[in-house]
Amino acid sequence: MAHLDEIRGLAEYHATRISSSPRDWMNYLDTAARLYRYPFMDQLLIHAQRPKATACASLELWNEKMLRWVNRGAKGIALLDETMQKTRLRYVFDIQDTHKVKGGRTPYLWQLQEKQQDALLNHLEEVYGLEAKDAGNLSDALMATAKYMVEENLDEYLDGLTYVTEGTYLEELEEDTIRSEFRSLLTDSIYYTLASRCGLDPLERQEEMDFVHITDYNSLSVLTFIGNATSMASESVLVDIGRFVHRISLEEMKKGIENSEERNYNKFNTLICESKENNNRIIENKYPHENEG
C-alpha cells in the first residue's frame, strides 16, 4: 500500500514530467481522453501509474455493480481523495485487472463510427452554434467547439494563475502574454482530447510545436490550471457526444432489427407464394384431364 506523502510526491514529480515536452503532454492527453470522466489530478496519477488504462473504477463498483472480480495480485491505482476534511488515499482498478463472474458486465465505452460523423457534426453545430464555415468536417467542428469552450470560460480558467507563478517559467512573462499563451495551449489541448476520444488522429491537424508552451507550466501549482481547464471543458463536450453516439447507435440497431424482421417477413411471404405455386403445379400435373370434356 502506498503512503499519502508518496502519492503527493508522485503527483508533483509526474507534473514536471508531462510538462517537460510537447510529446510528453500529448501522451498524457491520450490517457486523459480515455478517462475524461475523471478530474485532472486523478488523470495525472492514473497516467503516472497505468498510462494504458481504459476504464477505472473502485473495487466496490467492479464487485457490486458490474459483477467483476479484481484479479488476485492486481495492484490498485492510488488516487488522492480530498472530499473529506482530511486528505486520504483511495484506489481504483483498470478493467484489465478484472474478470467477469456469473452475470458480470462489461462497461459501455462508446465508439464513434465513421458513418456517424456527419450526424455528430450536425449535432455540434446545433449545440454550440457553430457557423457552417467552421464545420466543414468533424475535425473542423471539434476545433470550433474547443474555441467556443475556451472563449466562454477563459476568465474562470485563468482565475488565480498569476498568484502561483513564483518559481516557474511563467514568472518572467507578462500577464497578457500568459493569457494569450494559455488560450492557445488550452484550445489545442481540448481539441487534441476531443479528437483522440472521437477516433480521429489529432496530428493530422496539429503538430508538436502547437504545445511548445506547456514547458512553461513546469510545476504542479501552475500545471493544475491548464490541466483542470482541459479536463473540465473536454468532459462537458465528451459527455454530450457520448450520449449522442449512444442514442444514434441504438436507433441504428433498432432500424437494423426492423429491417431484418422486414426481410424475414418478405422472405417468408415469398416462400409461401413459392409453396403455393409448387402445389398448384403438382395438382395440375397429377390431374391434367380432370375438367376436360
Where are these regions (language model features)?
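N-terminal accessory/interface modules of nucleic-acid-binding and processing proteins
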Residues: 1-293
